[in-house]
Amino acid sequence: MIRISLVIPTHNRAAQLVAALESVVRQDLPRDEWECVVVSNNSTDDTEARFAAFAAAHPGCGLRLVAEEGPGVSYARNRGLREAQAPLVAFIDDDERVNEGFLRAYLEFFETRPGAVVAGGRIVAEYPAGRPAWMSKYVEMPIANPMDFGERVRPFPAGRVPGGGNMAFRRAGLASYGGFDPTLGRVNGELIGGEENDFFERLLLGGETIWYVPGAVMWHIIPPAKLTGAYFRRLSYNVGVSQRLRAEIHRRLPKTFVLEIAKWAATLVL
């Protein structure tokens, strides 16, 4: 019986996807207890062929690929939720790798807390070319979104929510919240996001607790291309666009503007 599903959205990153899958197939759960659903979001590279070859080389791992034509990661994640066969669904992205106990950690968490609906795990930044000497935690936050809140299961700290590349849900508890907003989220390589924060905000407003599960570890792989001034300026601009879109959706633009200015001012002081 499939007890937990893992969903990986992907768009034109076949090589990175295969690297992510290499870590997925090493999960320490019995193979008949989990599945992995890759959602190819309008990929035009060799994603389908490379996935098929990888799946053929790893029979019995419950790997399958579905195509989603709706543009953007929100459409892909919503498709993954619909396709998942298990009552529990975890998400990672295609530029990551996970520990062998990733799915087990989430499975054991939800089984011991039957009222829990949402959780997120530890995120570690990984730099294949080495961590730059100039990197600070304030620059690393928007680029890699690292998270480490200790060694015990606990609610997420106030003001923090899971990263979209390491989150898990109990499907039965999501019915009243809808899915990820398709007007938010990255499309065709653009850096506009905010769909995860929007979803988590709805869950919090609904009275849910977001739990931190330290045993679900994800390494976010940061290539040299994401360590340039041009990339950081583009990312910073699109973070602002994402915040504005979310503020307009929730009709709180003035409050959001003041809060974001305060946060950026604090990072400059610190």
Over which residues does each language-model region extend?
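Catalytic core of nucleotide-sugar-dependent glycosyltransferases
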Residues: 192, 205-209, 215-218, 228-254
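Short aromatic/hydrophobic "clamp" motif used to bind/position activated sugar donors
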Residues: 89
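Glycine-rich, basic loop-to-helix element that forms the pyrophosphate-binding segment
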Residues: 68-84, 105
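A short, conserved alpha-helix in the catalytic core of glycosyltransferases
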Residues: 164-178, 183-217
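N-proximal low-complexity "stem/linker" segments adjacent to membrane-targeting elements
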Residues: 1-26
